[in-house]
Amino acid sequence: MTKGILGKKIGMTQVFDEAGKVVPVTVIEAGPCVVVQKKTVEKDGYAAIQVGFEDIKETKLNKPLRGHFAKHGVKPKRYLRELRLKDADKYEVGQEIRVDIFSPGERVDVTGISKAKGFQGVIKRHGQQRGPMSHGSMYHRRVGSMGSNTFPARTFPGKKMPGRMGGQRVTVLNLQVVKVDPERNLLLVKGSVPGNKNSLLIIRDSVKSK
C-alpha cells in the first residue's frame, strides 16, 4: 500500500546508531492527518486522496472551505494537500493517517518550500567562481561573459544570472527513516529537508527504492 502524510518541520538534532556513530536527523511532526476527499478515475480522471492536517477554527475559513469540510463530514483543517497514490481506492473519507504507517529503515521522499534567500549573485546562487581579486581585474563577483557579441547579439534564455534565490518547491529523494515515535507523532529522517522550522512538509514513499 503506497503511503503519504503531511507534517511540520521541527528542526535538526542527532542520534546514535547501533555502532555508536552520530547520525544527523531532521525531526518532523507527521500527522495525524485525515482523508477529506477521494478522487476516482471514473469521476475525476485520476485517483488521489485529499489529506487535511492540523485543526483550525471554523471561523478562520472562508465559506467555500467550510462547505467543503461540512460536505464530507470532516473537522476543519489548516492544510489541505492532494496525494496521488496507486491504491487510493483503499482509503476512506474520514480515515485517520498516523505516523506509524512508516517504520525505521524505510526510504521516503520529502517535499517542502526551500528557505528564501532574496536577491543573490551568481556566486551564491549558482556556485560560479569569482574573478581575479588583483592585477587590474575589472570585476570580482560579476557574471562574466554572457554570450557572443555580433552574433547572435543577444543573451540566450536560461543563462545563469543574478536573481531571487530559494522559496521554491523542492523534493529530497530517498531519505532513510531512522526512528518513528507514534505517541508524539514524530518522524526522524536522516539528513536535512527543505524549509524553515514549522514549515509544511509532504512525506511519501520513495520512488527510487521501489
From Swiss-Prot:
Gene Ontology cellular component annotations, sorted alphabetically = cytosolic large ribosomal subunit
Q: Which Gene3D superfamilies match?
A: 3.30.160.810, Translation factors
BP-aspect Gene Ontology terms = translation
UniProt cross-references to InterPro entries, sorted A to Z? Ribosomal_uL3, Ribosomal_uL3_bac/org-type, Transl_B-barrel_sf
Q: Specify whether rRNA-binding is a keyword of the entry.
A: yes
Q: Which UniProt keywords apply?
A: Ribonucleoprotein, Ribosomal protein, RNA-binding, rRNA-binding
Signal peptide bounds: none
The UniProt GO MF terms for this protein read: rRNA binding; structural constituent of ribosome
Ranges that cross the membrane:
none
Which superkingdom is the protein from? Bacteria
Q: Does the entry feature the keyword Ribosomal protein, yes or no?
A: yes
Recorded hits in SUPFAM superfamilies, A to Z, give: Translation proteins
Role, per record? One of the primary rRNA binding proteins, it binds directly near the 3'-end of the 23S rRNA, where it nucleates assembly of the 50S subunit.
PANTHER family xrefs: 50S RIBOSOMAL PROTEIN L3, LARGE RIBOSOMAL SUBUNIT PROTEIN UL3C
The UniProt family comment states: Belongs to the universal ribosomal protein uL3 family.
Quaternary structure, per UniProt, is:
Part of the 50S ribosomal subunit. Forms a cluster with proteins L14 and L19.
Q: What is this protein called?
A: Large ribosomal subunit protein uL3
- Protein species of origin: Caldicellulosiruptor saccharolyticus (strain ATCC 43494 / DSM 8903 / Tp8T 6331)
